[in-house]
Structure formats: structure tokens, C-alpha cells
Amino acid sequence: MQRVWFNKTFSSVGAAIRLIREADQASEYEIVCSSTNAHAPVFLAAHESALEPGGLKGLDYLEWCLDFCLAHRIGIFIPGKEAALISGEQARFEAQGTRVLCVASQDTLDLLHNKARFYETVVCSTPPAAFRLVETAQQFEAAWHELKKDHAQLCIKPSVSVYGLGFAVIDEERSSAQLLLQGVQYHIGLEDLRRGFEAMETFRPMLLMEYLDGHEFSVDCLGDNGRLVCAVARKKSLVVGQGQLIDLRDDILEATRQLTETYGLNGIFNVQFREGQSGLGLLEINPRMSGGIGMACLAGPNLPYLALLGFDRGFDTLVVPEVRAGLRVGEIAFAMEMP
């Protein structure tokens, strides 16, 4: 039996572990997970769980991971926290008997986490929306006037962020206080934003971009070192409560194939697109499982299990079920006792 470790990562890992265990009828894999949260819900999904020490990062965390793999007889390590650093040190893990399933090389992972740098390298059939990198009020003003010539509405977001934190559509008519009182989320008043930037000499790198206001597509993917093995695209409804539609658009699948090849992507990852006035635009590549991985797998392929099996035994041996296009999927919350 292979012991497989998921270290601290995003909450979607719980769904992935459950999917692996459902498919692993012969009990060939024993799943170990760890977190700094003693009450992490993911502990209920795994065969075995462990508490990570808080505050560790960088090389200190890397050394802890090496020790953990040795002490717990880990055969396959699927890293979340410090994945880029761990990817660059795979040889050290392999030397002590642990194979590491990484989405990409250390350099590529660092690139994908910085949207400004990443966007500058993209060459595919659905490029990112028009953008400018700004770090001062003067740069913001110049970029604003340049982009507004061609685009009716703009948005802003950090170059480095997760979960969409820091994203806002820029409202030219209402103040931030008015937006707050009207319950408008993810918007900010233009004049308030200007005043805020002017009060700072410099600020963290931000992307001023064309706002894409159409349907968003989240594509959960399985790759084999640059070869796209499978992709399940979910079209998100613009109306709350209508779920998501499995939509295998040719242009999305082709762009995803191109990106997989260009960046040498491997295992499970997620690519996001959104429609705008000029067509489909690339939002980002998430080098990890998405929060909607469970919904994607309802369409047929059990992506977490296929990723593990392919990495362990070779992707050429995989039998990948056909994706059920047109399926409407969704998720509901349920009550549970915490560990």
C-alpha cells in the first residue's frame, strides 16, 4: 500500500481525498493529511491526520516536510503549502524514497503566482484582458486614461493574490460609501481609490484591467508534464442559485491545451476564463485543485484519483471516462461534527 501525503493546503483537498477513497476500491492508497488547524474538517476524510507546527515557512518548512516523509513512510507527496520551494527540491525527497507530485517546476510556479509576470508570457488563442501594472498614483492615472480609450469599464486587483482578494470593479459614479450602503460587493469608487493611492508614495503591484463582465469558465484539468489528459469546463451562471453547466467549448479546450503545453503543467490544476466585450479572456492558471473539483468530477472523470494513479503508474495506462457535456452541477452545504 502506498502512503500518500497532502500537507496544509486549500479546503478543496477534503473533496479530493474523498474522491480518491471512493475510487480506490482495492485500498491501494493510504491517505495522510496535515494542517496547522487541529479542527480541520479534512481530517475526517483521510485515513490518518497530523498537526503541523505553526509559523514554519521557507527552508524551515522544507526540512520539516523531509523529516515528516521519512518518519511517516510517505511514498507520494502532493504539496500545497510551499509547493514551489518543494518542487525545486524533489531530488532530496526522492533520495529518501518519496516521489513528489508537482504541478510545475519551481520557476513556473513562482511565475503563475505573479499575474503581471505571467500575463506578459502568455501566448495562446485566448489572451488575458488588456492590463497595466501600477505601483504609484501617477502610474494609475496614466494607465486609467490609456485603457479607458478602448474599454468602457475597468477593474483592479493585486498582481499576487488568491481567492480574488483585493479585486474590485471601479465605479465612476458612486463613492465607496454609497456602494457600501447599497450592498454592492467587489466595487470601489474611482475618486476614493484615487485619493487612497495619492496618500501613498508607492503601493504593492496592482493590475488595472479591462473588466470582463460575461460568463466565467472554470476548467479543472489533468496534465502529464505538458500534455493535457483531460479537461472539464464549468460555465458559471450569472444568476445565483442556478448552478454551473459542464460546457466543453472548443476554444476553451484548445486554449487550455496550449497553456498546458507551454507551461509544462502536470497533475491537477485549474484554468479560468471569462467572456468580455471582445470575446473570451484568460484570467489565471491556478496550480492546484479548484474549490469546485467535486462538481467537475460529477461529469465523469475522477480527476484526483486519475492524477494519483497516472503519477504512480503512468498516464498512458489510464482509462479516462468521457466528460458528460451539458450536465448542470452544484453544491449544497451540510452540518457536520468537527474533529
Where are these regions (language model features)?
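ATP-dependent carboxylate activation and anion-phosphoryl transfer catalytic cores
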Residues: N7, S237-V240, Q244-P339
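Active-site nucleotide/adenylate-binding loops and adjacent lid/helix of ATP-dependent enzymes
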Residues: L109-M206, N225
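Short, charged, surface-exposed secondary-structure boundary motifs
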Residues: V42-L44, L59-E63, T108-A116, G164-G166, ...
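ATP-binding N-terminal substructure of ATP-dependent carboxylate-amine bond-forming enzymes
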Residues: M1-A104
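Phosphate-binding site of ATP-dependent enzymes
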Residues: L180-L259, Y263, R274-E275, G279-G281
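Residues that mark the start of a beta-strand
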Residues: M1-W5, Q153, L207
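Residue-level detector of structured alpha->beta connecting loops
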Residues: R73, H151-A152, G264
